[in-house]
UniProtKB/Swiss-Prot annotation:
Pfam families: Late_protein_L1. GO terms for cellular component: host cell nucleus; T=7 icosahedral viral capsid. It comes from Human papillomavirus 11. SUPFAM superfamilies: Group I dsDNA viruses (SSF88648). The gene is L1. Forms an icosahedral capsid with a T=7 symmetry and a 50 nm diameter. The capsid is composed of 72 pentamers linked to each other by disulfide bonds and associated with L2 proteins. Binds to heparan sulfate proteoglycans on cell surface of basal layer keratinocytes to provide initial virion attachment. This binding mediates a conformational change in the virus capsid that facilitates efficient infection. The virion enters the host cell via endocytosis. During virus trafficking, L1 protein dissociates from the viral DNA and the genomic DNA is released to the host nucleus. It is found in: Virion; Host nucleus. Belongs to the papillomaviridae L1 protein family. The lineage of its organism: Viruses, Monodnaviria, Shotokuvirae, Cossaviricota, Papovaviricetes. Residues 492-501 have a biased composition (Basic residues). This is Major capsid protein L1. Coiled coil: none annotated. GO terms for biological process: endocytosis involved in viral entry into host cell; virion attachment to host cell. GO terms for molecular function: structural molecule activity. The keyword Disulfide bond applies.
Length: 501
């Protein structure tokens, strides 16, 4: 007997599937380049925590293990004074910037930053044990210092980068939860903002929610979140706005090993060990942990203070700065020295500890240089529809809008809107454009008045001219040698005569 197949038949969608188009397909690049650079960017603060007085931050937290996310604001090229007015037609075209080169300059000497905790949950030294630990007392915390994992990172895109970390999840309603149970974990993806902590070697997690004793990690991360860049999510971005390219260098090794004090929430199963007598009858803590170390800091492995040229981005956006924004995210732990300062309370001929107050500060120095290329976009109906699907705010910045579809219903419009005799009317929507990043923290760098076409007057511009083969403009005229006369001389030649001997 014949029977139809039980397998599922998949029918293709009736409409064609939309395809993401690379920016090179509709963006035309010109041969006009501009150089732009920031001023010397400096930051000074306490490396472990912010100092507050009367609920006001007087000294911010500035650590070598924080993300520095620069929000670079560019001028509108459509309102820019161009050297050639015939480059584009404002009725059918719009101009955009393309980032073709950059250099992130770092000041200050190389150094290793030390962090720690005066009350760290360290119980036994399990690397070189002198004896078997018994039951811990009420409080076994000690003062421990360490250095962190070494990281150098630079990410460039026209949208803020994404980071991932593990946070506290939500238990199911049918699960009974007791005090002291291990909380569920949830992978959280969020925007990396300026001042967020990087992964220091203890994992990318929310230490404030997942370590309630505030003693398992050093001071600068025990009450905050450490994020790691979500490279997988940014690489899967269909438009490629968050990550044009990135530079990364990480290294770490485990320096010391010890275990934690406290009750082991999930004891070692009995079938994995044979208990002994005396002090071996009770098993010691099996919660092992290490102290990280970034090892040697050397100038031979530096990612900064050198130019990088963007020929082809990893995504579909090949360096186009939509919205006239560019985000540069920097991490450099090779310059994480924490300076100690001392101030005397009173002058004395003999040294006394109480006569001096000790302080800590961390300083950072940056310099950003860019090469931007002027590009044009022809506003065809197909291109405008695609850009509206990708990012509608781009068309709004270009003073374009889509007309709503016709409404078949008859709408009511009152003459006296403020009258108390009629029902309350809906508030009019705000016409001013809202900044999508107003609730986020970034280090804003305004380059609206820093553009220059004289590339040969700047270090990065001269490197670009040498690399690309373009000729820079010269401001002074050089002397031109007059060409020599090519026609033969009319003076008669003297005949040679032979002399008789």
């Amino acid at each position: 007997m014949w029977r139809p197949s039980d397998s599922t038949v998949y029918v293709p969608p009736p409409n064609p599937v939309s395809k993401v188009v690379a920016t090179d397909a509709y963006v035309k690049r010109t041969n006009i380049f501009y150089h732009a650079s920031s001023s010397r960017l400096l930051a000074v603060g306490h490396p472990y925590y912010s100092i507050k007085k009367v609920n006001k931050t007087v000294v911010p937290k500035v650590s070598g293990y924080q993300y520095r996310v620069f929000k670079v604001v560019l001028p509108d090229p459509n309102k820019f004074a161009l050297p050639d007015s015939s480059l584009f037609d404002p009725t059918t075209q719009r101009l955009v910037w393309a980032c073709t080169g950059l250099e992130v300059g770092r000041g200050q000497p190389l150094g290793v930053g030390v962090s720690g905790h005066p009350l760290l949950n360290k119980y036994d030294d399990v690397e070189n044990s002198g004896g078997y630990g018994g039951n811990p007392g009420q409080d076994n915390r000690v003062n421990v210092g360490m250095d962190y994992k070494q990281t150098q990172l630079c990410m460039v895109g026209c949208a803020p980068p994404l980071g991932e970390h593990w946070g506290k999840g939500t238990q199911c309603s049918n699960t009974s939860v007791q005090n002291g149970d291990c909380p569920p974990l949830e992978l959280i993806t969020s925007v990396i903002q300026d001042g967020d902590m990087v992964d220091t070697g203890f994992g990318a997690m929310n230490f404030a929610d997942l370590q309630t004793n505030k003693s398992d990690v050093p001071l600068d991360i025990c009450g905050t979140v450490c994020k790691y860049p979500d490279y997988l999510q940014m690489a899967a971005d269909p438009y490629g706005d968050r990550l044009f390219f990135y530079l990364r260098k990480e290294q770490m090794f485990a320096r010391h090993f010890f275990n934690r004090a406290g009750t082991v929430g999930e004891p070692v199963p009995d079938d994995l060990l044979v208990k002994g007598g005396n002090n071996r009858s009770s098993v010691a803590s099996s919660i092992y942990v290490h102290t990280p170390s970034g090892s040697l800091v050397s100038s031979e492995a530096q990612l900064f203070n050198k130019p990088y040229w963007l020929q082809k981005a990893q995504g579909h956006n090949n360096g186009i700065c939509w919205g006239n924004h560019l985000f540069v995210t920097v991490v450099d732990t090779t310059r994480s020295t924490n300076m100690t300062l001392c101030a005397s309370v009173s002058k004395s001929a003999t040294y006394t500890n109480s006569d001096y107050k000790e302080y800590m500060r961390h300083v950072e120095e940056f310099d950003l240089q860019f090469i931007f290329q002027l590009c044009s976009i022809t506003l065809s109906a197909e291109v405008m529809a695609y850009i509206h699907t990708m990012n509608p705010s781009v068309l709004e910045d270009w003073n374009f809008g889509l007309s709503p579809p016709p409404n078949g219903t008859l709408e009511d419009t009152y003459r006296y809107v403020q009258s108390q005799a009629i029902t309350c009317q809906k508030p009019t929507p705000e016409k001013e454009k809202q900044d999508p990043y107003k609730d986020m923290s970034f280090w804003e760098v305004n380059l609206k008045e820093k553009f220059s076409s004289e590339l040969d007057q700047f270090p990065l511009g001269r490197k670009f001219l040498l690399q690309s083969g373009y000729r820079g403009r010269t401001s002074a005229r050089t002397g031109i040698k007059r060409p020599a006369v090519s026609k033969p001389s009319t003076a008669p030649k003297r005949k040679r005569t032979k002399t008789k001997k």
